[in-house]
């Protein structure tokens, strides 16, 4: 398995019910956060990569929508994921 798949499977098992549960909102938010953090490090080296920056903005927007959905559905799960990932509210 590649390093990326190992990281992804660890995130899924940490935030999901089992290793196959990738559809849960918390898992999707955690996976997006991991990719966003990776791209932020990428931009420190490649400042003029505007195509990837557009993808980053799309990921941030999708994560915000998932967080808003989770906040409306279950506030305790929302607070838990915010604290675990150390995100701002």
Curated annotation (Swiss-Prot):
Similarity-based family: Belongs to the universal ribosomal protein uS15 family.
Protein name per its UniProtKB record: Small ribosomal subunit protein uS15
Stored SUPFAM superfamilies: S15/NS1 RNA-binding domain (SSF47060)
Gene Ontology biological-process entries: translation
This protein's UniProt keywords: Ribonucleoprotein, Ribosomal protein, RNA-binding, rRNA-binding
Gene that produces this protein: rpsO
Quaternary state and interactors: Part of the 30S ribosomal subunit. Forms a bridge to the 50S subunit in the 70S ribosome, contacting the 23S rRNA.
Any one Gene Ontology cellular component term annotated for this protein: cytosolic small ribosomal subunit
Record-linked InterPro entries: Ribosomal_uS15 (IPR000589), Ribosomal_uS15_bac-type (IPR005290), uS15_NS1_RNA-bd_sf (IPR009068)
